[in-house]
Each structure stands twice: as C-alpha cells, then as structure tokens.
Amino acid sequence: MQQDSNKKKGKGYRVRPAFARERLNGRTRRVCSILGLAAVVLASAVVVHSLYVIQIRDGAKYRQYAAQQQLLDTTVKATRGEIYDANGITLASTSVVWNIWADPSYSSILYTTSTNDDKTTVRTFDPTMCAEVSQGITLRLLSGDGESLDAVDTSSEEYTQQYQTVYDALSKIDSSYVVLATKVNNAVKLSIEDYVSGFNKAHKKGSGADRIGRVSVSTEKSSQRNYPYGAFAAAVLGFTDGEGVGTYGLEKSYQSTLAGVDGRTITRRNAVGNAIADQNATTFAAKDGSNLVLSLDVNVQEIAERYLTEAVAANNVENRGCAIVMNVKTGAILAMASKPDFDPNTPLDYSANLAYLQEQVAAEPELYTIYLRDENDSKKFKLDENGNKIVDPDPDYTGTYRDILWKNKAITELYYPGSVFKVITSAMGLDSGVATMNTTFTCAGAYGVAKETYHCAGHKAHGTINMADALRQSCNLYYIQLGQRVGSQQFYNYFDAFGFTERTGVDLPSETGLMKYYSANQLGEVQLASSAFGQAMAITPLQMCTAVAAAVNGGYLVTPHVVDKITDTNGNVVEEIGTNIRRQVISESTSDVIRQMMEYEVGNGTGGGKNAYVSGYRIGGKSGTSEQLNMHRRADGDYKKVASFAAVLPADDPEILVYVMLDDPNNARTDYSSILAAPVAGNIISEVAPYLGIATDGEDRSQTTVTVPNLISTEWSNAQVQLNIKGLKHQLMESASDQTAALVTCQYPYAGAKVPYGTTVYLYTDTYDGSLTEVPDVSGKSADFARQMLAAAGLNCVVEGDANGVVQSQSSEVGASVQRGTIVTITCG
C-alpha cells in the first residue's frame, strides 16, 4: 500500500516533458480549427466564383475563346462585279492572281547555325544561297508565263529591281513573313511552286547536296481589277486600291453594289492551327457583287476621246479638255472624256504625261506652288522674317500630278461658260415674257453699266438686231440689255431652276458642290450684266450640258446618269435606272424657239457655229469663249481662255447633245471657240450621228456628186470641217511623228476630183505623199458587203447597176496596190 501511495506522489518516477502541440490549450485549438475551416471555405468560394465567372457570367466569352482555339474561321472573298458598256463590252473585270510570300526564319538554306559559349544559337546569313534562290524566283516572275526564262533580260533595270526586291526580302532571316511579289498570274505561280519544290528536293538530307536545307515559299490567292482598254473612260470608271476597294469613279460610287458580301467557312483545326478535313464544316456562301451596265457606249466614247485628244494636242491646251455626249431626253451619258487622263490599271503612274503636267504646274504658280510646313504644326506654313510663306526648294509634285489626271473635268472643276450661256439667257427672256425672238436691242460697240464699259468681241458694233441674230453673232451687249429686262430676281430664279445652284446628281463621286454664283440680292448692275453673257457665274461642264438639254428637250431638267442598269451574276436585271425629271424649267413653246435659234446659229454651215455643221443633219449649237478670271494671267497679260461648244441634233427634235470644252488653248492663230471647239464637236457628230442612227434632214443625196476641195496647207482640223460641210468623210492618217497640229501635206482623192457624196478623203500631215493599199476581191458579194470590204481596205466605192444584186465586176484589179481613198466602181446585177 505504501508503495502505491508513493507512486501516486510521483516518487521514484521521471516525468516526460510535453510537446508544444500538447501544450496548446483548448481555446487555441478551436481558433485554429475555425481558421482552417475558413480557409477551406474561402478557397471553395474562390473556386465557386471562378466557376461562376467562367461558366455563367463570362461563359459565352470563354466558350468563344475555346471555339477559336478549336475552330478555323476563313473568309471566302466575294468576286467583284464587272462593268459593261451599253453593248455588253467588258470595261472592268476581276481576275484571280497570287501573292508570293516567304518565311525566311524557316528557310534553313538561307543561313547556317552555330552555338555560342552561352549555349545560344546564332544564325549566319548565307548570301550565296540567297542569291541562287532569288535568281530562280526572279526569272520566273519576269518570264510572264513561268517558262520563257531565257527571254528574260538579266541586264535590264527591271530585272535588277525585281531581283533586289526578292533578295532583300529573303535576307530577313529572322522574319516569318515577307512578300516577294504580288498580283502574279497562275502560270508564274505554278512555275515558282515547281521551282521551290525541286530546289528543296535537291537540298534535302541524302540528296548529295553541298548544303542541306529548305526554302519556305508559299502563295496566297488574291484578285486583280482589270481594265482591258487601258486609258479609256478612265475618269468615269475610276479604279480600286490594293485591297480591291473602289477609290474613284464608278468603282467608288457603286462600291457596295460591286463589292458583294464576303462569305465564311468554319472548320475544326489541329494543334498547329491547320484545317482538318471535316464533313461538318459550316460554310456561309459569299454573295458576289452585282454588275453595272452603262449607258456609255465604247464606240461613242472612242470617237469623243480621239477627237478630244487631237484637239488638246493641236491647240496646245494647257489645262486639259473634256467632251460629253448625252441623251437630252433621258440624261443618259453616252460618252464622257477628260484628256489627258490615266490608265486605271496603273493609276499611280503619270510618266506618260509628265511633260504636260510639268508645264501645267509651272503655268499656275499661285495654284500649285508647294510651301514649307512648320515643323511643330504641319497645318501651318513656315514663314520668313516678313511673314511670307517660304517656297519649298525641293517640292514633290507626285500627289499634284496624280490629282490633276484623276479629276473628271466634267464634274469637278468650275469654269465661266461664256457665250454658251446666252442660250439660257435667251430662254429666260422668252419664257418670262419680257422678250420674243424678234425683240431688238442696239449694239453700238460699247455699253456702260455703272462704272464698267462692256464690248463685244473685237469691239464690233452689231447695230440693231433681234434675238436670233444676237445669238448667231454672239452679241454681248444685246444680252446685257436682255438680262436687265429680265431683272435680278427673275434671272436668279431661272438660274436656280436650270440647276446651276446645285449638283446635277450624276452617279459619279467628287461632283463639286462649291458653286460660284450670285444670289438675287447680290446681283447688282454689274454682276447681272456679266452674268447675262456667261462671264460672272462659275459652273461645271455637266451643269451646262443639263441646262442646254432642258432648253431644247421641252424644258425638262433631267438627272444625268452613267449607269443604265444593275444585273446579278446571271445577267438578270436587279435595278434599272430610269429617266429622272427633276422639274420643268421652261415651256414647250419656249423650248421650240430655242431650238430654232440654235439651228440658225449653225445655219447649214453658214452661221456663227458653221464649223460644227455636218452635211445631212439638222444641227443646233452655240459657241462660248470665256475668260478664266480666277486663273493666273498669260505672259501677255490677257486672261486665260476657255473655248467651248454645245451642239444638239436633230435640231427639230433633239436626241443627243455633244459638248466640247478646251481649257486654256494656246493656238497662235486664235482663241475663238467657233474655230477651236466647234470643229471638234462637228467631227464627233460626223461619226457618232450615223453610228447612232440619228435622223438626217431627209434629203436624198445618194446620187449627188461632190467636188473635193483643195486642203493642202490647211490645218487638219479646218480641213475636216470643210469636208463635213460638203458631206465628205475624212480619215487623218498616222504620221511618222506626232504632227497633229501640222498642216495637210497630202490628200487623196486629190483636189478637184468629182466623187460621190459620202466619199472618204484621206489626209496626211507629214511629208509622205500617200499610203498604198491592196484592192480586195469583192466579186459575188452583195453591194453593201462589197462596200464594207472596200472601206475596210481604205477605198471608196461607187455602185452601178442593180444595188440589190451581187457584184459582177470591179473597176480596180484584184490585188493591185493603189492609194488609199481610190474610188472603186462596182457593177452589180
């Protein structure tokens, strides 16, 4: 018992020290337990919140991320619509081309690798291998067909530039994407692919090559806009940028119509991002763009451009020229030309017109001078100590040159219309009832208005004349007095009604809205006087055309348009552009009087506009020679001039209007539009009228014989006018050099020859005395077909016998070499 008692007291036993955790009291354990539980709960809350965010709140976003990693979304490009002329001839189309690119970083043949002491890998460029690959690719790029490698001139500048482009791109061995070439055709693309494939096979392991490696070159599909006729209707068609987006002309104004809507293909992709063949791929088909069918006719456009180009060169026109052929009843534009212009296939290239552009810029220093910009604020100019702008000593006119050529002169530039506007002033006076065609005013050669004294051209005194004679003689003083009778308010009301205070609404971009005119309360005595004969209000050529059209079509102002209809890819008409009559400006009876006076102006080759006359047609017209008051003056101190002419036909019931404008002609002989612009309009009419089937004057001249005039030493344009008046056709033959402003040195048939009405006279403006052609065999052909065959050979034709029969004989031996213009008589039966 004693022993047990001692044990209880601890005697004879060693007590073991307690561990730290055993020393924790109960309260501490509870705190720790609570904290641990809180940590677990907090962690769970974080997880739950994350799950909530990922799966519920932002679930859609994360599912999209996951889908993007698993799915490949590829754009399917829509094919841009085409542009056709009125006859269905393609003016703009899209073709498939290829861009060639490379991955130099993956092209191990272009570099060698080594390891530094710090174990980093270093690449060393191999210029020899890069040169070999660059040469192989360049030869194929310049071959055109991928095969004619031997035909490539490796010493040419073109080769050097292309080679350097490829070499520089491939030498970027740390880059994964470099472009070697763009817009490559399929044949060249396949040739490059074959070359690269063969090269890589020759340099793979086991091939025995000195260097083992590969070059990574790939292709990507692209598109290219093509304009098959080059610099043709360029200002109307416009062009697209590198991405295929319309940036000018119809390409811009109808961008959404032509572009279509891109499609998409969604497929699964593998770990490296490539598409996996999958039957469950989702495709949203692209909707190809619609096509534009124009009212513009390539044949009419070609005629207008040809004669305009000749006139610009012959008359040394400094600020370009424009021509318009328009249906006066519908507003449909059959031709619209600005010359010189550009090739929409290469719109950035102005080299063909560089000399012309340099002269134009130099002639207008106030308009085109480039000044230095402030380094701190590019919107401000740098000024000298006197506060004057500092001229850039090394100006870059690239943008200026392109802007000049790209502008559609018919709608983007303002000019003073001059005497063509007298047609409108006449309509104002007639329609308002303040005058009739027989109303007279006196022209004494000078007329004072306020502090200004006005004169007619050449200070002529026309005496007392009526409205018809005033229009024919282009009497400024008559129209000043007529304008005064109309009055400022009424003058402005008609000016506004004829559409001069607003855009025409033509379906082309960049039509200027910065009209320059006087409102009724701004039309003081002087402003009204100058406006009455077209020398105070600035308008666009197309505004003048629509106003003249309204004056002769019964008084209706129509909206001009270039697009006739829109079709889908199958040719079905989606939309048809009808005639839009904006309002009636003058009465039918007033319009009838205007038509009579305009025909009197041309006068069958005897009036003031006689140089626009073409035998066999009833033509009305009016010339206008105006001063460009807002332009830099000529060296002689005189204002620069604008020569214009507006013609309508047939005069009794007009269908078409032909308008020509030459901005700042520098013809040493004259400034008068009746001599410079009227012949251009007449020449256009001489070919356009028969092509369009415009009604003739009804007189049968099939049996008429005409005497060929002597045209030697006559300016070619005047020679053509003489032929137009006599009812003879003309053909200006190509000269050995550009001599469009030269005199006629040879003609055939010769002067004095008696020829049938409608015979073609061939004109030469160089020292060559004639061009030979071979006589075709027309035996057994119908008279009409024989006539066409002979015309194609440059020969004239006289039909004898039964015109409904076939050719029995011909006067010139088959195969004989004769001068162009020779008359071949065929006998039919």
Sequence positions of predicted segments:
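Soluble non-cytosolic domains of exported or imported proteins
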Residues: A78, T124-A131, T182-N186, G244-Y248, ...
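Extracytoplasmic
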Residues: V76-T79, A86, S93-V97, S175, ...
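Acidic/histidine-enriched alpha-helical segments
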Residues: L149-Q161, V317-T330, T442-A446, S510-T512, ...
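Periplasmic/cell-envelope proteins involved in peptidoglycan metabolism and beta-lactam response
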Residues: M1-D392, L405, L414, Q489-D496, ...
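Sec-exported extracytoplasmic/periplasmic mature domains
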Residues: T138-G146, S197, D241, A259, ...
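Beta-lactam-recognizing serine transpeptidase/beta-lactamase-like catalytic domain environment
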Residues: A92, W98, N270-F284, K329-V420, ...
